[in-house]
Amino acid sequence: MFPKEFRYSPRNLIDLLTEMKDTSELMVDLAYSAMVYDDEDIAEEVLNLEDKMDTLDYHMKMAAMLSTRRVDEAEELLGVLKVAASSENIANAAGDIAKIVLMNMGIPMELKIALREAEETIVRATVAEESVMSGRTLGDLELDIETGMWVIAIRRSEDWIYDPDRETRLRQGDVLIARGHDEGVPLFFQMATTKKFIPREIEHDKVLKDLEHAVDIIVDMKNMSELSVGLAYSAILFDNEDIAYEVSALEAEMDSMKYELQHWVLETAKHVDDVNVLRGILHLASASEAISDAAYGIADTVLRDIELHPIITLAVRNSEEVITRLQ
């Protein structure tokens, strides 16, 4: 879906596809973290990125249409548009996970607490004017050493910086997305905002049966959905059918895990007073499986032998690390 208001401006197809890849991957990461930590601020960032993906998708389609005049040129861009559409689908599914938090869908707190033990923390903090971070580079700050946290993305007004490096200089008003261990969050937050970090008080009753099984499934679904996205982009970079088949296998496994998690919810519903506390888990299962489906849509361009335009390879190579399959 395109934004209601937009203004077309010429964009490079390679840059657009690179940005769509980076944005969709970040959204998946943030969406799961928002759900696990019940963090509305991070969930809102996911929806902001979803709006951005709509705009990128619009510009991608416009640029593709304007760059073709002949049938053979249009055929060459079919793969580009398929990859872009799949990236948009990944973003939409990540947005659905974020809405679990914003719409207060039911995921029991004891399940979230158990999930936190298996995941690193993601925190959002805005750089204040008086912050020691303002005006300094990430290399100077050495946040990974000082706090045990590292910045994975920065929102600067409406622009995003993905995978910032040591030379990236922070500014007042930058919204930092950082990953690390729970112990480092208070110091990182205070360094950025100059305010004391106040963790949320958590109260919950232990009512869930076979909780460990649900945690295992959700952690596996999260890891497999993220892996399938990374593998899918690697498959098209190397035009590698072996990697593409791995994505297909992950997609089939995700289908089974979705049904298994749904079955767990139905069984657990017998033992809870309010079944609404489990509603979000069903939503999570469907959204996670949708991410895997979309990743398969990317890999399918290789399996169907759709001609891969050089734009795709350049876009993926311009992004982050890639994955190869070892025999």
Give the residues covered by each predicted segment:
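Cytosolic, long alpha-helical scaffolding segments
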Residues: 1-327
